[in-house]
Regions:
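Conserved ABC ATPase "signature" region
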Residues: 103-120
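Helix-to-loop junction immediately C-terminal to a conserved catalytic motif
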Residues: 48
Length: 223
């Protein structure tokens, strides 16, 4: 269980997040939606430890997660994927910063196969399509054994086929017990992928509902 309790963040005098609380269970895919500049991406960066909160607590499995420990539990996939990809090949990307062992190499190969990237293992990440880069970023998160994955606009710039491919892979990960949090403005992707929505508005958690009403979700994304 991931739990967020009364999270606060300010930049100078501007309070970006105010008293945000929610929890997520293994297997959930949750959309984080709301207007631009509402605090959604800030929330993602706080969860993953890229930013430090000014108040509140983030817990996983009932234990508080200090900022320094979050990267091993919560993996944040940015909207600008090119800024996260440094390897000379897909395999190299997965193994960057790690001591390569036969077991680790086998796991990397298994993940590339799982995410339909095995045929591109020796290619440079820059040559991949947007959808393929998203799947590579997911593979990196899984190799680091992150039980929680936060994606910031994962379908931005993707065509319908690649969007559906990413959605399918997220469902596969959720079935394996991962918690998926997806910051998105993409109504079609949220409806196809997520079962629940958290609505961030003016830095607060304005709503939290199961996605069984497309009109309610549409209204939340437009306000």
């Amino acid at each position: 269980l991931l739990s967020v309790e009364r999270l606060h963040k300010r930049f100078g005098l501007h309070e970006v997040l105010k008293d945000v609380s929610f929890s997520c269970s293994p297997g959930e895919i949750v959309a984080i939606v709301g207007p631009n500049a509402a605090g959604k991406s800030t929330l993602g960066k706080l969860l993953s430890g890229l930013l430090k909160e000014d108040g509140g607590t983030i817990r996983f499995a009932e234990k508080p997660l200090k900022k320094s420990r979050r990267r091993g539990v919560i993996w944040y996939i940015m909207q600008d994927l090119d800024s996260q990809l440094f390897g000379e090949s897909l395999t190299d990307e997965l193994l960057t910063g790690k001591k390569e062992t036969p077991t680790l190499k086998l796991r990397a190969d298994e993940l590339l196969t799982l995410l339909n990237l095995a045929e591109f293992a020796d290619r440079h990440p820059a040559t991949l399509s947007g959808g393929q880069k998203q799947r590579l970023a997911l593979a990196v998160a899984l190799l680091n054994e992150a039980p929680v994955i936060v994606l910031d606009e994962p379908t931005s710039g993707l065509d319908g086929r690649n969007m559906r491919s990413v959605s399918k892979q997220l469902h596969t990960l959720a079935q394996k017990g991962h918690i998926i949090l997806m910051i998105t403005h993409d109504l079609e992707c949220a409806l196809a992928t997520c079962s629940r929505a958290l609505v961030i508005r003016d830095g607060t958690l304005a709503d939290d509902f199961q996605i069984d009403d497309a009109w309610r979700l549409m209204a939340a994304m437009r306000e």
